[in-house]
């Protein structure tokens, strides 16, 4: 016996013998699937500093619909003030996630969140990150398409020359 979403009548999980219904946000995928750490493919993302990485876990961030991504930022790297049009839920997977709110980077506004913490960020909220105490990994859950706009266009890595392979897709 599984459960279903009343509005879709598509079973999400029915046990090991069933679960073959496909989902609208994962075309061609069965309803039950898993992603283990060794399945995660980290790539450079043009809107991030060159040493930061992004991995698509579920969905397609550049398209309308639910998606889950992971973001890995090495020690001392800052993501300068930016905003996303979509509401987001961040879950800290590892390291300490420092996030502050505002249009200007201000270290005194940073809040530290340990692994397991969940941070809800409403769409169009200006914020910034800093890997202040070492590398961190966050998981972001949202409804796409993913958008990212820097508050100062000079902080946007897409305005600089980058030669490393990157995650493809349109980011508005």
Feature-to-residue mapping (PLM):
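Extracellular/periplasmic catalytic domains that process cell-envelope and extracellular macromolecules
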Residues: 48-50, 61-63, 83-84, 91, ...
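Glycine- and acidic-residue-biased ligand/ion/polar-headgroup-sensing regions
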Residues: 74-77, 83-104
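Short acidic-glycine-tyrosine-enriched beta hairpin
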Residues: 103-123
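Boundary at the C-terminal end of the N-terminal hydrophobic targeting segment
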Residues: 4-8
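Short beta-strand His + acidic residue motifs that chelate non-heme Fe in jelly-roll/DSBH
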Residues: 79-81, 99-100, 121, 126-132
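Conserved short histidine dyad/triad with adjacent acidic residue
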Residues: 64-84, 122-124
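A short, N-terminal "cap"/entry segment at the start of jelly-roll beta-barrel domains
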Residues: 9-67, 154-172
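Double-stranded beta-helix
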Residues: 31-33, 108, 128-172
